[in-house]
Regions:
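C-terminal helical subdomain
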Residues: 185, 189, 211-270
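Canonical Rossmann dinucleotide-binding motif of NAD(H)/NADP(H)-dependent dehydrogenases/reductases
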Residues: 1-31, 37
Length: 273
């Protein structure tokens, strides 16, 4: 039986790192993607030492940049003949003020939605080479709300929590569209709820929310990672899940998902030239 090839973006910290630790105990070949090289190499080393499992690789990439997403996908295609599992978990310290990347995209939109849209697309052949490929989009906030396309990147009005919720909604619509478009791949959308990670103390507003309410209702990264690994290793049907793997109803319309796909294709074309 072949060992699984598992790619985890954001696998160097928080929920992503906890997911990687669990997969290491299964003997899977792990590829961790993260922006900070020192943190990434340290995380890979820690997982190797704690699990006794040597097949843990780290790829440095700033996934807020589409050029880096493409470069990462190319490296993966050259080095691995297939990808059995792709876990999108990259995030980071959410900015209080609207922040724009070097390619002109709002940062939260770029990292938590657009990079996922593009990386999955770039790896379709790698996923298609696996016998039972699975993709998990991990995203907090959001719901099945209507997308305000004129403000999809906070162009008219930006606030941090609005950006987080917007990214959650976009991930929901992305999963809905992918499930229809690529029936040979199983897609999961998992909302972990409030999780005790470094992100919750990344700025004063996050820390305030965490200290007032989060301590009572939050979960650990290990608890959230257990849900994700169960989804991906057991025979759970594709779809939408919350904490403790409670099923969520996909009440979004296919029209909204299609509109987002068209918007994303056009945006990608404008950036790529």
């Amino acid at each position: 039986m072949q060992k699984l090839n598992v790619l985890i973006t954001g696998g160097t910290d928080g929920i992503g790192k906890a997911i990687a630790r669990r997969f290491a105990t299964t003997g899977a070949n792990l590829i961790l993607v993260g922006r900070n090289r020192t943190k990434g190499e340290t995380a890979a080393g820690e997982i190797i030492r704690s699990s006794g499992h040597p097949a843990v690789d780290y790829l440095q990439a700033d996934l807020s940049l589409l050029s880096e997403v493409r470069r990462t996908a190319e490296r993966i295609r050259r080095s691995w003949d297939r990808m059995d599992i792709l876990v999108h978990c990259a995030g980071g310290a959410f900015p209080l003020r609207r922040t724009v990347t070097a390619e002109g995209l709002e940062w939260v939109f770029a990292v938590q939605y657009f990079a996922r849209f593009l990386l999955t697309r770039e790896l379709l052949d790698s996923l298609g080479a696996a016998p039972a490929p699975k993709v998990a989009n991990i995203a907090g906030g959001g719901g099945f709300h209507q997308v305000d396309f004129p403000n999809i990147q906070g162009e008219r009005k930006y606030d941090m929590f609005g950006a987080i919720n917007r990214a959650g909604t976009l991930n929901n619509l992305l999963t809905l569209d992918q499930t229809t478009r690529y029936p040979d791949i199983t897609f999961y959308n998992y909302g972990p709820g409030m999780v005790r990670t470094a992100v919750m103390k990344s700025n004063w507003l996050m820390a305030l929310v965490f200290n007032t309410a989060g301590r009572l209702i939050s979960r650990t990264a290990e608890e959230a990672s257990n849900d994700v690994v169960r989804l991906l290793m057991e025979e759970w049907p594709g779809g939408f899940y919350g904490p403790s793997l409670q099923r969520k109803k996909a009440s979004a319309s296919a029209d909204d998902a299609l509109k987002l796909k068209i918007y994303s294709d056009r945006l990608l074309e404008s950036i790529s030239g």
